[in-house]
């Protein structure tokens, strides 16, 4: 039976450490060096940008798996001297504390639950750090332990266990331990009580636990200190503490409380200790980290660069104007090859330099796309209709466009747009049509033509009632928007379409490249499903209404722009001053960006001194809305009135909201030098 190597989108979170060695891409390490240096780092990004994959490298199981596989550990040796422990808040059970919240819970009860959360996290992380020591010790690999800076001396391990088990951070609750295993068992017993409590198997925790709650972060600092003072780890060995799925804590704001916010503030308190003994690594979605990270039960906040720094996975792989600085393609190509190798798909070919290009081929050239959208005879009919609609244009220009269409339908369509722009010269100082170009020449400058190709292809396909085609390596990478999850999601659907197209075949019969029409079908299905699953997070329904309204508006705006005056109108731009006057809209747009519905960037306005922000729909939504995914020229200038109408699902823009009515700028952007 044919299988899909991309069936499991979250493979790096579900497989064993041994398999992780095979599919993990070291490219991400080269770009994320800050994660392996001292200091607190917030690793944030949209779903599926590689946060958990990166944090998993800090786990001892990953380090040991690389050693067993005789594969070089991807972290440079000078940065790889560390141990650590961590917690995944979704998996450890901490989110179940909210089950004990009641609408009639008084302040004291809520506060005690907050401090119990802190104690639970302390115990879990310290237990995981001890587990790390034991895992390295059990390998009996002296060279590996030397690289990490761990001593296997039993006397040192015993001295550590004796001293740390009786440290005052525990409030005297643990007996003196003679070994790390004994101390680990004592911690596990306490965690076991918490599990029974969280699962409602007991009504209350024992008084011994209630009377010995630890201070958030304190035992974590003490375990790092004790490990070094006893010689179990070297003074130069870094101690990293991982806390993943941080954004999940806000889901605990239930029963009329802000319990989840308080739990986040407790974590902020641990980070804000400004103590170099440990370095925190917080994994969170883009929307998860608060603008003002308040410290628990204070008005104080963490300071960027002093208390923490960001590693923004979205920015790491975001496409810039200079495509040569775009890191995502190499990362995606490596992941693609590793997935195929792990699935043993044509394994003899899976080490080629660019297997993705072999599978998807180059993105079709514009002329090839035109041939797919429209036949020559149908294209001539379409151009004739366009010519007949040109007003105040002399016969010479119409004949020129007609002759152009015989050899180049795309240029003929663009010529109609160029003529429309120039024939509107009454609104321009030097308007009007110029002299006819020579038979083999074109009236426009090269950049004018290049910037309008995506819009021309969209309009030509629509004129012949054809769907836009989506295929080729560059196209798929662009639609991925720098997100590895979206990339894998697209490949999953492309592969499914390919398997359907080869029903009854053996895996050996599947040969690259995947046909363009099959790729396009898979991309469209992926886009439709991605839009349908837009149900996560707060305001999910309103975000979906907004995205639908924006998508419909942008499509109609582009289709109706026959003069192609605004080829960049597959996005929109708002004045920052206007946004600051509408905090409700700002909050909504931040949520939409945080959940990946929109992409936001600073916008250099054509108005001197004006500060704006521009927004685009996530590229993967382009196929479902039938709009180009490439961002060229200026986005549509709108005001907050239009944006608020989109919140209500209204897409029609009134004259008072248009860019030209607002500031009179966009009409000047495509002037007489075209």
Enumerate the language-model features and the residues they cover.
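Walker A/P-loop-proximal flanking segment of P-loop NTPase domains
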Residues: 1-101, 115, 582
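Short linear interaction motifs
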Residues: 21-40, 104-109, 218-225, 259-266, ...
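A short acidic (Asp/Glu
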Residues: 54-55, 96-100, 250-256, 289-296, ...
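P-loop NTPase nucleotide-binding core
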Residues: 55-236, 309-311, 317-403, 407-409, ...
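Short, well-ordered alpha-helical packing segments
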Residues: 56-59, 126, 261-272, 337, ...
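C-terminal leucine-rich, beta-strand-based interaction scaffolds used for sensing/assembly
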Residues: 90, 215, 375-674
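The catalytic "switch" region of P-loop NTPases
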Residues: 219-240, 248-466, 473, 516-545
